[in-house]
Amino acid sequence: MAKPDLSVEISGIKLRNPVMTASGTFGYGKEFSDYLDLEKIGAIITKGLSLRPKAGNPTPRIVETPGGMLNAIGLQNVGIDAFIGEKLPFLRTVDTPVIVNLYGNTLEEYGELAEKLDRLPEVAGLEVNISCPNVKQGGIVFGTDPNAAAEVVGLVRRSTSKPLIIKLSPNVTDVVRMADACVNAGADALSLINTLTGMAIDLQKRRPILANITGGLSGPAIKPVALRMVWQVSQAMAVPIIGIGGIMSATDALEFMLAGATAVQVGTANFLDPSAAQTIAAGIEDYLAKNGISDVKELIGALKI
């Protein structure tokens, strides 16, 4: 039997395999280049970018929890100008699609970022983090209100012709409603889920462990929630989905594909094993070969109910 076909496509972005790296867990790519072959994964998704450099939250801002971790990094990043001048030159040398994750605290910031990134041919697509507070509207999180989310997506859509992936928050009562609002406003694809809001407490000090009090929960603990949401959205609409949440192995990745994901993102696993994404991609190929499956796309949405 010939080698299985692992290639998939997300809104015109062709991936050699369905394994991407999750924003915020893989730096800007170069940081991990000594630990894995960047040309053996499907795509690199950068650390979230803002218009200006951001220092992030005070420490402590990471804490291990049963089955995962909480982080309150605060979207620390170098800013768009330093990314273009210092980070992008390396990414140009890698034959793997680069998707830039971006965020803003106002509609205008999202639009300006998208316009700047639209001019960069090296950027294959944009992933928009809408789990941010709108500082001009009382701090409401864009990604928890369908109307606010649609405003962001619509503005970014008008600001770029690049494939547009919207990263959905799980901190909502109806993820399908949020997904529908984003797709109707111009999203080409959806990635889900972002982290669940959680907290940890130091019993002896009677204080929160994180300086920020709350943080984003990721890792195996959130996988069942992520699987459920991916499945719900895939059943409700025909849109490419990228599954995220507790993917630590090829088995995890394949479960997300059965639930309806076209591709997956590996996040927390990168902290435990810097070569995790490549290992998972190889594991998917091994599964296909052992089970006589010629094309990974046969598994997308193949869950039997």
Curated annotation (Swiss-Prot):
Protein name per Swiss-Prot or TrEMBL: Dihydroorotate dehydrogenase B (NAD(+)), catalytic subunit
EC number: 1.3.1.14
UniProt cross-references to Gene3D superfamilies, sorted A to Z: Aldolase class I
UniProt cross-references to SUPFAM superfamilies, sorted A to Z: FMN-linked oxidoreductases
Pathway as given in its UniProt record: Pyrimidine metabolism; UMP biosynthesis via de novo pathway; orotate from (S)-dihydroorotate (NAD(+) route): step 1/1
Top-level taxonomy: Bacteria, Pseudomonadati, Thermodesulfobacteriota, Desulfuromonadia, Geobacterales
Pfam families on file: DHO_dh (PF01180)
One Gene Ontology term from the biological process aspect of the record: 'de novo' pyrimidine nucleobase biosynthetic process
Cofactor, how bound (note): Binds 1 FMN per subunit.
Enzyme class: oxidoreductase
PANTHER family: DIHYDROOROTATE DEHYDROGENASE (FUMARATE), DIHYDROOROTATE DEHYDROGENASE (QUINONE), MITOCHONDRIAL-RELATED
Gene, per the UniProt record: pyrD
Subcellular location: Cytoplasm
An annotated GO cellular component: cytoplasm
Keyword list, A-Z: Cytoplasm, Flavoprotein, FMN, NAD, Oxidoreductase, Pyrimidine biosynthesis
Catalytic activity: (S)-dihydroorotate + NAD(+) = orotate + NADH + H(+)
Family: Belongs to the dihydroorotate dehydrogenase family. Type 1 subfamily.
Quaternary structure and interacting proteins, as annotated: Heterotetramer of 2 PyrK and 2 PyrD type B subunits.
Binding site for substrate: K47, N71, A72, I73, G74, L75, N129, N194, T195
One annotated GO molecular function: dihydroorotate dehydrogenase (NAD+) activity
